[in-house]
Regions:
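Phosphate/ribose-recognition catalytic cores of enzymes acting on nucleotide-derived substrates
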Residues: 73-179
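Short, histidine-centered active-site or binding-site loop motifs used for metal coordination
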Residues: 1-2, 30, 150-152
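Glycine-rich, Lys/Arg-enriched anion-binding loops that position phosphate/diphosphate groups
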Residues: 17-116
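N-terminal Rossmann-like or analogous alpha/beta NTP/dinucleotide-binding catalytic cores
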Residues: 1-22
Length: 179
């Protein structure tokens, strides 16, 4: 069911003709089903955009991952008692899951991730911030791969910083329970 190009007018035969002309091969694989449902890139995109991480993981056969370089942020997480690794994506076109709070892993290290806007702070743009549990190493400028394990909650605006901090710690506890 593969289509590409304008109006998805390209098909397998088109790709095979292009391959012959340009010197590459095309292997057609049968459809892939999980639990009786067809797995496609469109289905994976819909699941991620809906925040259905566990279903996406099941369909992919592995956790969805986000890769990026750890950059300096504004230090707000550290000031609030929960330092974060701020990610600059390797691929600016990477499909990201629904904005929210997620339980994640980075290699063997467990953590919690905020992905999206920061409505509690006026003028604060969207970010991808990962707090790693029981981890205190300098990883600035390192590239890390964050495996998204589970959805915790959506983005919320808090009336006070204390309310935000309480939610951050509750999110951390929930992520630890999940992981």
């Amino acid at each position: 069911d593969h289509g590409f190009g304008k109006g998805r007018s390209g098909d397998v035969e088109t790709l095979q003709r292009i391959g012959t002309k340009l010197g590459f091969g095309v292997d057609v694989v049968p459809p892939y089903d999980v639990d009786g449902e067809h797995v496609s890139s469109s289905r994976i995109r819909r699941l991620l955009e809906a925040g259905s991480i566990e279903e996406a993981t099941h369909a992919l056969g592995r956790p969805y991952s986000i890769r990026g370089r750890v950059a300096k942020g504004d230090g707000r997480g550290r000031q609030l008692g929960m330092p974060t690794a701020n990610l600059e994506l390797d691929d600016p076109h990477k499909l990201l899951p629904l904005p929210g709070i997620y339980a994640v892993t980075v290699g063997p290290v467990k953590g919690v991730m905020h992905l999206g806007p920061r409505p509690t702070f006026v003028g604060a743009g969207p970010t991808i911030e990962v707090h790693l549990f029981d981890f205190d190493q300098d990883i600035y400028h390192h590239t890390i791969t964050v495996e998204v394990q589970a959805w915790i909650r959506g983005i919320e605006k808090f009336d006070t910083v204390d309310g935000l901090v309480a939610a951050m710690y509750a999110d951390g506890r929930k992520a630890r329970e999940i992981l």
